[in-house]
């Protein structure tokens, strides 16, 4: 039996993601006349591979995820929607976060600190910062020479938790 399969990035608790998005099911089922199924994935790569493997019909990605799939299988995915904020702005922004009590207020304050990224396929949590940070006068070309360490923290929620727990000093996430 045909079904409409929707994938979600699962860097939050999978059940929370499914519960929060279950309201989509009746709309999809009414619009397409087939059952809708919701899936979460541990990371961007799993979601991307499910889409490229024909196991999803719809999912959300940032530009980095879309570009990665386009490079791997040109023309297979088609962008159909973009996010619009209540202000009318389109998209979202990459931001560096730190604990309020860290004393970190500027990029210069992050020298020698531990840096966390969200996911290798995240536009806001890795791609943009990995290009833009080295271009700043402070970092001057090398993340490795500026920060004491860099790591992936397991997604956007993982970055927040790692900063809160003190596992990293600063990390990249998104805001809209």
Enumerate the language-model features and the residues they cover.
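Ligand-binding "clamshell"
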Residues: 69-83
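Pocket-lining segment of extracytoplasmic ligand-binding domains
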Residues: 114-176
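Short loop->beta-strand "edge-of-pocket" segments that line small-molecule binding or catalytic clefts
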Residues: 5-12, 17, 109-126
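A bilobed periplasmic-binding-protein/Venus flytrap-type ligand-binding module shared by bacterial periplasmic
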Residues: 9-10, 93-104
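Short, polar/charged alpha-helical segment
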Residues: 3-4, 13-35, 131
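Short helices/loops that flank or line small-molecule/ion binding pockets
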Residues: 45-59, 72-74, 108, 155-172, ...
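Short Pro/Gly-enriched coil loops immediately N-terminal to beta-strands
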Residues: 81-93
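Extracytoplasmic/secreted proteins, especially bacterial periplasmic and envelope-associated proteins
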Residues: 19, 23, 27, 46, ...
């Amino acid at each position: 039996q045909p079904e409409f399969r929707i994938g979600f990035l699962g860097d939050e608790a999978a059940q929370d993601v499914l519960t929060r998005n279950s309201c989509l099911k009746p709309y999809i089922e009414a619009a397409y006349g087939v059952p809708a199924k919701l899936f979460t994935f541990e990371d961007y790569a799993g979601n991307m591979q499910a889409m490229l493997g024909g196991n999803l019909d719809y999912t959300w990605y940032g530009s980095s995820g879309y570009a990665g799939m386009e490079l791997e299988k040109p023309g297979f995915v088609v962008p159909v929607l973009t996010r619009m904020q209540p202000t009318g702005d389109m998209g979202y922004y990459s931001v560096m976060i730190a604990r309020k009590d860290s004393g970190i207020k500027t990029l210069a304050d992050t020298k020698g600190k531990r840096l966390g990224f969200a996911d290798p396929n995240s536009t806001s949590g890795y791609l943009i910062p990995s290009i833009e940070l080295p271009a700043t006068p402070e970092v001057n070309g090398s993340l490795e020479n500026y920060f004491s360490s860099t790591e992936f923290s397991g997604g956007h929620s993982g970055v927040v938790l790692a900063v809160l727990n003190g596992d990293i000093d600063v990390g990249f996430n998104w805001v809209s």
